[in-house]
A protein has these predicted regions:
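Short loop/turn positions at the edges of beta-strands in beta-sheet-rich folds
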Residues: 10, 20-22, 78, 88
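N-terminal cap/lid segment of alpha/beta-hydrolase-fold proteins
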Residues: 1-13
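Alpha-helical elements of Rossmann-like donor-binding domains used by nucleotide-donor carbohydrate transfer enzymes
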Residues: 2, 34, 65-72, 92, ...
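Active-site loop/oxyanion-hole signature of alpha/beta-hydrolase fold enzymes
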Residues: 47-87
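Conserved hydrolase catalytic core segment
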Residues: 80-111
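Helix-rich cap/lid subdomain of alpha/beta-hydrolase
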Residues: 103-131
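Conserved HGGG/HGGXW glycine-rich cap/lid loop of the alpha/beta-hydrolase fold
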Residues: 12-57
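Conserved beta-strand scaffold positions in the cores of enzyme catalytic domains, especially
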Residues: 6, 45-47, 104
Length: 131
């Protein structure tokens, strides 16, 4: 079940959905509805509505600004170092998020479960205490 919440950050009420329990995984696209598929169990997913999209009011921002907003969300929500899956507009944030020290994976055109399972099968994702 998706649970909606918001975080007041940089003068904006950033709206997000949270689904599940487990290690945190952040899903970033224009809005939470860009992730319609069923999400796998065993993770705590955070699905953001970026400013100017979905339920988050505010001006649309440049990718660099959005990356700082996403990084601020991670810090304020005390998520540690989650994997950030990107789709749509989120893909433009990838290089900026990496420059800020976040770990990103593209997820355009594939199911979240497929992205996570393919990376897990190659041992590229540490789901232990190092998230």
């Amino acid at each position: 079940m998706r649970r909606a919440g918001y975080l007041h950050l940089y003068g904006l009420n950033l709206v997000f959905d949270r689904v599940g329990k487990g290690p945190p995984v952040l899903l970033v696209a224009e809005e939470a509805s860009r992730w319609p598929e069923a999400l796998p169990e065993g993770y705590a997913f955070y699905l953001l509505d970026l400013p100017g999209y979905g339920r988050t009011e505010g001006p649309r921002m440049a990718p660099e600004e959005l990356a700082h907003l996403v990084a601020g969300f991670v810090v304020m929500m005390n998520l540690g170092a989650p994997w950030v899956l990107l789709r749509g507009l989120g893909l433009a944030l990838g290089p900026h998020l990496e420059a800020l020290g976040l770990r990103v994976l593209p997820a355009e055109g594939v199911e979240v479960a497929e992205v996570l399972s393919s990376k897990l099968s190659y041992g590229n994702i540490d789901l232990g205490g190092n998230l």
